[in-house]
Amino acid sequence: MPLSNRRFNHKIKHALEARETQGLYRQRACLSRADQSVYHQGTSLLNFSSNDYLGLAQDPAILSAWQEGLTLFGAGSGASPLVTGFHSAHKALEDQLADWLGYDRALLFNSGFSANQAVLFTIPDKHDVLIQDKLNHASLMEAGLLSPATMRRFAHNDLSALTRLLHQTNDKFPSINPLVITEGVFSMDGDLSPLANISEQCSQHDAWLMVDDAHGCGVLGDKGRGSCDLAGVKADILIVTFGKAFGLSGAAVMCNNDTAEYLIQFARHFIYSTSMPPSQAHALSAACRLIQSDDWRREKLHDLGYLLFENVESSIQLVDTHTPIKPLIIGDSHKALSVSNALKAKGLWVSAIRPPTVPVNSARLRITLTAAHTEQDIKRLATTLNEVINDE
């Protein structure tokens, strides 16, 4: 075997062994799903790790819309959007999103990851400055690091730190308009970005604001319009993803006309990717309608969150949030896995989230509630958490 092959094999083996020793080794679980439960190796477990916040992933109206879309448009789009992959269902969804969220345009992508990276790889150049919250999603951080622009980071939700960076950028690069990037809801902590204050700072320092609202759109704001609506601000660029509250997959970049056209001309993630199936876009249109009409889903999420905190013992360090994401910080990765497995043994699926997804020594259980859960489900979760945590 050539030396280069042995070197790669050694590197891979060493990295895997190190990750396992650190309690950070990740494995996929092959699951099937029905309602709010998952089935693993023949066992039914109540699922508290899904991002299907509004319970739309298995809603009959969404399933019917996708089946209708298959009949109308076939299985796949057949090409990238600039060839023959842009269909009437895609156009209808883009127009619907733009009207609902108050933007000139919506541009569809296959994932939130690709939408974020398309924006940050395409719009900034080497003369620009990106300013990001330190807890932003990996897709944003990776794109910032690989972007030709200069990237600066500020401590999580720290307005003073953001203001200092904006002042420094304005002083050092007076002709540059910085791009400030944050999430609306932070996926691992469930907390909200102080968008009203951030937007004010952006206005004062002539900066653009980009908000990734993957976990806020559909859940927060009037008719589910998201974190920006809740805060009363309009981001220059808004990222909406469809793998959470929409119950499907994909994403859209919300922006003005010129920005949309710029991305169409220059964003490689857009130009060189096959479009999402038009049947999927048809189903997403149905999801968008339900999100706007079904206020009861958001009201139920609020009530279930309150019920959980009513029933969990005060000694348990469950973080109260205004979102369906309820983190329980454990700290040690091995212990987080142990607690997760103990819950699994009692019929609850609650995933342990460990570094590098979260900072070192902040491993946690990421508990998520959905509108598909019942009050009985929440009481069972609380009772089991009380038992398991007290036993640890």
Swiss-Prot record:
Signal peptide start and end residues: none
Coiled coil: none
Amino acids binding substrate: R26, H137, T357
Catalyzed reaction equations: 6-carboxyhexanoyl-[ACP] + L-alanine + H(+) = (8S)-8-amino-7-oxononanoate + holo-[ACP] + CO2
Keyword Transferase: yes
One GO MF term: pyridoxal phosphate binding
Pfam hit, one: Aminotran_1_2
Role, per record: Catalyzes the decarboxylative condensation of pimeloyl-[acyl-carrier protein] and L-alanine to produce 8-amino-7-oxononanoate (AON), [acyl-carrier protein], and carbon dioxide.
UniProt-recorded name of the protein: 8-amino-7-oxononanoate synthase
Annotated source species: Photobacterium profundum (strain SS9)
